[in-house]
Amino acid sequence: MGTTTNLRSWLYLILLFIVVVGVNAQNRRPKNVQVAVKAKWQGTPLLLEAGELISKESKQLFWEFTDAWLGSDGDDSDCKSARDCLLKISKQASTLLAQPVASLFHFSLTLRSASPRLVLYRQLADESLSSFPHGDDPSATGCCWVDTGSSLFYDVADLQSWLASAPAVGDAVQGPELFDFDHVHFDSRAGSPVAVLYGAVGTDCFRKFHLSLAKAAKEGKVTYVVRPVLPLGCEGKTRPCGAIGARDNVSLAGYGVELALKNMEYKAMDDSAIKKGITLEDPRTEDLSQDVRGFIFSKILDRKPELRSEVMAFRDYLLSSTVSDTLDVWELKDLGHQTAQRIVHASDPLQSMQEINQNFPSVVSSLSRMKLNESIKDEILSNQRMVPPGKALLALNGALLNIEDIDLYMLMDLAHQELSLANHFSKLKIPDGAIRKLLLTTPLPEPDSYRVDFRSVHVTYLNNLEEDDMYKRWRSNINEILMPAFPGQLRYIRKNLFHAVYVIDPATACGLESIETLRSLYENQLPVRFGVILYSTQLIKTIENNGGQIPSSDAVTNAQVKEDLSTMVIRLFLYIKEHHGIQTAFQFLGNLNTLRTESADSSEADIEQEHVDGAFVETILPKVKTLPQDILLKLRQEHTLKEASEASSMFVFKLGLAKLKCSFLMNGLVFDSVEEETLLNAMNEELPKIQEQVYYGQIESHTKVLDKLLSESGLSRYNPQIISGGKNKPRFVSLASSTRKGESMLNDVNYLHSPETSEDVKYVTHLLAADVATKKGMKLLHEGVRYLIGGSKSARLGVLFSSSQNADPHSLLFIKFFEKTASSFSHKEKVLYFLDKLCLFYEREYLLKTSVESASSQMFIDKVLELADEYGLSSKAYRSCLVESVDEELLKRLTKVAQFLSWELGLESDANAIISNGRVIFPVDERTFLGQDLHLLESMEFNQRVKPVQEIIEGIEWQDVDPDLLTSKYFSDVFMFVSSAMATRDRSSESARFEVLNSEYSAVLLGNENATIHIDAVIDPLSPTGQKLASLLQVLQKHVQTSMRIVLNPMSSLVDIPLKNYYRYVLPNTDDYSSTGFDVDGPKAFFANMPLSKTLTMNLDVPEPWLVEPVIAIHDLDNILLENLGDTTTLQAVFEVESLVLTGHCAEKDHEAPRGLQLILGTKNRPHLVDTLVMANLGYWQMKVSPGVWYLQLAPGRSSELYALKGGNDGSQDQSSLKRITIDDLRGKVVHLEVVKRKGKEHEKLLVPSDGDDAVQQNKEGSWNSNFLKWASGFVGGRQQSMKGGPDKEHEKGGRQGKTINIFSIASGHLYERFLKIMILSVLKNTNRPVKFWFIKNYLSPQFKDVIPHMAQEYNFEYELITYKWPSWLHKQKEKQRIIWAYKILFLDVIFPLSLEKVIFVDADQIIRTDMGELYDMDIKGRPLAYTPFCDNNREMDGYKFWKQGFWKEHLRGRPYHISALYVVDLVKFRETAAGDNLRVFYETLSKDPNSLSNLDQDLPNYAQHTVPIFSLPQEWLWCESWCGNATKAKARTIDLCNNPMTKEPKLQGARRIVTEWPDLDLEARKFTAKILGEDVELNEPVAAPATDKPNPLPSNDISEDTEQDLESKAEL
């Protein structure tokens, strides 16, 4: 009784307190904010998403899941709600998965991360249907169909008929194109006709088609593929759970939302009344269990529910008074340390961190009053001696992650990758402890380049810096290389530091031009030792065709065969070198080139015999007494030095350099361009490497630099497929995952070993896929055998015969004999020599002859038996190969191999390829591939991928394995499986030593003995990064078995509040799925009880590839004042992922990025949907895409005339016109392109600067690009966002005629959108020419985007909404307003269509009083930009003219400082002169200094005008009262409402006072807007104040609703 009385008495005190402070419960009712982000595409079924997710674990599991769901296990008739279905689907999948993968699966399912893959299938389904028109009735297609490439079947009976007469395996049939992501039924036989089923599990038609096709696949009739699609309108034809998630657009998670407390020194709030908007989904209820100033209100209400209104009123008051964004300096000092203390001591540290940093303004006061434990502070300060204060680091299993790019989808992919690896290793019986060690292993970085050891007698050096007289005056102190020098400045040291050796055919134009370059650089005393290795292209082709050997010859043959010119030149060169010295020998080559160029029509022409004779005679004539012609004749007849010249070509062949045609080696580094620029770049790249070794004493004055470099890291052979380096990453497949029902096809492989090593553990396994019915396959197999004969202690070789079952009988016989040898005699000493002879015999007698010429099978058998006896093998064993049952087993094995190659490795079933510990080399160039390449591959794979795990595997104590099974083969298999699986990890090779940081007092340690994943983190909890990481780490802790060590690293001695925002990171939840119906509500960001009287601005923190825009937002999201919401309790906004961003980098080897290169992207049917150009900055480019299969190519015109795309990622030189790009997730894609100049175009430039109108006109007429960054129909479900029309065409429309005026502007917030409409009207009312407006769409409100199409139609103008995603490499701005400013200047060259030639930027708050056509047509004298200088008339403002003093006065040196409210961009000149690239370089340098670029969009072009010249417009083109004064107002062509820093007059007030026509334009715009939106227009707007010479003074403290000011005007000062 006493307790109740006490409770009631203090509640009465609470009520009394409320009355005293004057709190009105109704008015102070707390307000909330709710935000959702949806995908642009129509929803996708959750059941189909589950299939895609489970297939990531194993391709086979997709089929098991599908069969289980179609069976009784998938009966969902008892599911009464979306949540029931979610749990049913998750439970079904969990039966096929182990923990914690099953938990991660459930989370990924609620995350909807597989939805984009289904959108991709939808695109392919549309293309399938469009290939076979089905009339006007779309319903005729049904909900399922089968595509065979030649027909579509909507009925199972029709399919059965086709299956009965389907083409046989191996018959040439053009079926649908298959992709890596396709679900191919595991019983499908490679090479059989393809049948693709489009349909959805859960529909009756899918069941029927599936059963029929699965049966046919098992019978070997068809390759059965499923592409899961639920066509529109079929949702009602599926079982209860089959359509969950498909009805509405997908609601996404994995992003952050911030509500920042806005600095209201300048206000940008519209004074129009707030309109009542549509009601969205019911917002969440308030969480009363949260602590508010020590009270838990849920407990109070449980005890006294009848006092609910009084209790809630008190709670509301407490909430409204908790917000603080200011503290005294002394309270701030230890705030970071106090926060760390609160987190570390919490029962749930991660939850505590999230509650603090995501609600910081509400908790900062209580944090600042906490008593600090000095031990925490001391440890933090101690750690900060090793890591900078505030620095954030995150590592997953030892691999550092990029904090800037990290998002939930990336984190889930990385976690899944680690858990899958652990699962595969567990199946190999590897103990848990060893698995954790393996996963913590950091991969070695792939070297960017490799050195080839070319030291040989075949190198002829022209000079020697250490010995030649011409260098004697140079200094010999090697330490001078460490002296500072200007970029590009050479060091002249008498030491052979740089060795440039050209590998050339001296009879080719390229080879002889290289000699000219070499001699020129030598004569100019470049500090390089020059040399050559000469070879004959023709002889190397002969060597390739002769199995890698020089054909044996005799005198008779020599007399009959005409010697090729290259070999002749090499012999003459060697002769002259031997008799007349090196200088004369090089002079001979120079004379040869002179004669070639003088007599040839083209500089590309090769030499003729007369050139050789003439050059020889001319060279030695002054040096000999005998007639040079006689010497030449004698040399020809006697073939003097022939062996030496042939040996030189053989050396080049063995090095593998002949395929490069013309190349040079810089200290062993290979460059396939011989231009002078390439050589100088190579020197600059090599210099820091040499400097480092000199600095550390590894290179001294007596060191032979070349010997040292090549002895340490020189490879014996160059093969670009193996040592591609750079951006072409090797391709890996996990052999550990290539199992079906626990069995791997690789278990049946019998391996061959080098002599006397069959019992040794082999760290590297080469699997040769060889079709021995082809010369390529046989050559590869034979080289493999020779490789083992040559000796390898660390590798074994297995053969996967990829020959077709329909191969000729001799091939099948050869396979049987080879397999028998490998299975029964691999341990025999002479087995390899037997196989060598077997290969030779088979090649000679059967492979190289026609079936008519080849010997009989019996002869083959006899020969094999004879060889077996000769090499000590049992001929009886070979006779057993000939029984019929063996033939059947062989055919089964060939089928298994074909399935393995096709479905597991993604290769053609008859491919000739090499798989070395999972690394795939394909295609293999059999002409140049030697056994030495397998040695090279062995060395590379051992050093890069086996060494890091060798010690761990060798240290394992195998407890769950039968000791009898622990053979060398078992361990070799483990190395093969583990290293191949580890190689497929997508992870950084960077790591950090977290263990050096102390963690006793200031770290959060979350242990888990069974953890597969360990997280190391260094976090500043009071930072934007900390806000996001707090949520991400909680996800890992909840859904993945992780251990964590989180070291807190707050800033010390703060002087300002570190976080002035509220933040929510949106995560999915089971509660998003209805428990009463089949609706999926989707995750949302929910901010409860936000401050009422603070102005907030909303920003989204989305993954890097997302482009988002608001689609539902009644209120001004830039200026949220919740006390103005009235009866509405929750402000709601919905954003949409408008598109994903495809980004990339384009490079030309050994050259700068090909800036200006034009790229186009589209589908197979519509190849040009999007286009862009390549920046000079990192060769960067970007395009907007949706999920789907896209094809990238060079644009028609100069780009494709000069360049070609370089072929795949295996280092091959093939040039392809198309690059296929798959977008099937929400992470976008980064694509690395390499282009090569086309033959004959090597010296042409892509951009040819043009002056004058002719070039512009030509550009216009030949323009191929008229739809830059537009969506075609269906492209991301795109709405029409452009009033169509060519940007620069002359046309007549609705009374407007002439050339179109293009005007560009940007606005954010309702006030500036209001200004923007007025600016549009003022432009249109002053010109009769067509006008097209370009608006940056990122920040436009949904209302504006709804109104502008109607406005365009009413007022007869065109418009287009454009956007560009801020590149990840460019220094980011944090303030929204500064980002907006940056968009005005940083991306002008890439944000517009390439066909747009000129555009005028006009500030949204500007009023136009003239025909803008005059400005558009103005000659700006070839400058890329034209701005108006700041006025100088108003003397009252002299004290504010910053450009006339200090830094700006010194920097400008008499040039004017221009205002950025109006400017013209000549886009043709802007792109030609790389103005955009230059501006971005200046920006990147300056923006990192917080004191630079205070007015970003204005300061940047003014600062850069020495490099990016500006044409100064006449003053009349831009007038603003602050700087110009009223004397010149009458002549003003445009009026800008720029700020007055002296009076700070509100902008709306100034507009009404200064511009007479402004109120009428404003009223007209508001009336039109109200009409379109169906609202009442407010007519009680203040009328224009009388025009005065002085602005009205600022009100004192009482700011009226007209007192509006803007942030943007800071840029205009």
Swiss-Prot record:
Task: Show the InterPro entries listed in the entry.
Answer: Glyco_transf_24, Nucleotide-diphossugar_trans, UDP-g_GGtrans, UGGT_TRXL_1, UGGT_TRXL_2, UGGT_TRXL_3, UGGT_TRXL_4
Q: Which GO terms describe its cellular component?
A: endoplasmic reticulum; endoplasmic reticulum lumen; mitochondrion
Pathway where it operates: Protein modification; protein glycosylation
Renumbered residue ranges of the record's region Disordered: 1578-1613
Name the major location. endoplasmic reticulum
Q: What is this protein called?
A: UDP-glucose:glycoprotein glucosyltransferase
Subcellular location per UniProt equals:
Endoplasmic reticulum lumen
Q: Name one GO biological process term.
A: anthocyanin-containing compound metabolic process
Knocked-out gene: effects: No visible phenotype, but activation of the unfolded protein response. Loss of seedling growth inhibition in response to the pathogen-associated molecular pattern (PAMP) elf18.
Instruction: Recite the UniProt keywords alphabetically.
Output: Endoplasmic reticulum, Glycoprotein, Signal, Transferase
Recorded GO MF terms: UDP-glucose:glycoprotein glucosyltransferase activity
Coiled-coil stretches: none
Q: Which residues are glycosylated?
A: N249, N373, N1010, N1526
Which top EC class is named for this enzyme in its record?
transferase
Task: Give EC number(s), comma-separated.
Answer: 2.4.1.-
Q: What does this protein do?
A: Recognizes glycoproteins with minor folding defects. Reglucosylates single N-glycans near the misfolded part of the protein, thus providing quality control for protein folding in the endoplasmic reticulum. Reglucosylated proteins are recognized by calreticulin for recycling to the endoplasmic reticulum and refolding or degradation. Required for elongation factor Tu receptor (EFR), but not flagellin-sensing 2 (FLS2) signaling.
Family label? Belongs to the glycosyltransferase 8 family.
Q: Which Gene3D superfamilies match?
A: Spore Coat Polysaccharide Biosynthesis Protein SpsA, Chain A
The secretion signal range is 1-25
The highest taxon in the source lineage is Eukaryota
Give the required cofactors.
Ca(2+); Mn(2+)
